[in-house]
């Protein structure tokens, strides 16, 4: 299955707020179809919705998500927690968390168009796994800096997770450590995703 490119608002109405997909919020009580659907939810539906939340928030394909679940299963510790840590340490997600992009698809585009350097080298793979002490900067070109400057200026200044630091004047971010589970911005039960 390929990456989802359809209407984002439909997914938000169905699954709830997905800050990585879009910053828009649905109005409460505005969708009459949703009110008709509010029957008893089966266990399968609950697990499926949790998995879809994760997929659409991080912009993953089904195959990519399965690969991450497989890697998390082999690692030490809780599979669900390790899965979320793996997803949070992706380069596109870290750019989103730093405020250098308004959404994760926007961050993915910045990386694909070669505007981002990690430790002084161009990285054009959005799924690149960042490690502690990685320095994320933009290219020295004026166009790259202008893009990042627009994103930083237009984004609401939310509290930065403690595993990241940003210098907005030098367009530079630093990964301090692996993310702590309380800083994950998505309300999700990761165990249901692993069970699915």
Swiss-Prot record:
Keyword annotations: Chloroplast, Plastid, Ribonucleoprotein, Ribosomal protein, RNA-binding, rRNA-binding
| UniProt GO molecular function | rRNA binding; structural constituent of ribosome
CDD domains noted in UniProt: S4
Which GO BP terms apply?
ribosomal small subunit biogenesis; translation
Where is this chain's protein located in or outside the cell?
Plastid, Chloroplast
Question: Region Disordered: what ranges?
Answer: 15-42
Q: Name one Pfam family in it.
A: Ribosomal_S4
A GO CC term assigned to this protein in UniProt: chloroplast
Domain (S4 RNA-binding) ranges: 89-150
- Role summary: One of the primary rRNA binding proteins, it binds directly to 16S rRNA where it nucleates assembly of the body of the 30S subunit. With S5 and S12 plays an important role in translational accuracy.
Known HAMAP family for this protein?
A: Ribosomal_uS4_B
Subunit structure comment from the entry: Part of the 30S ribosomal subunit. Contacts protein S5. The interaction surface between S4 and S5 is involved in control of translational fidelity.
Similarity comment: Belongs to the universal ribosomal protein uS4 family.
Q: Per its record, how is this protein called by name?
A: Small ribosomal subunit protein uS4c
What's the name of its gene?
A: rps4
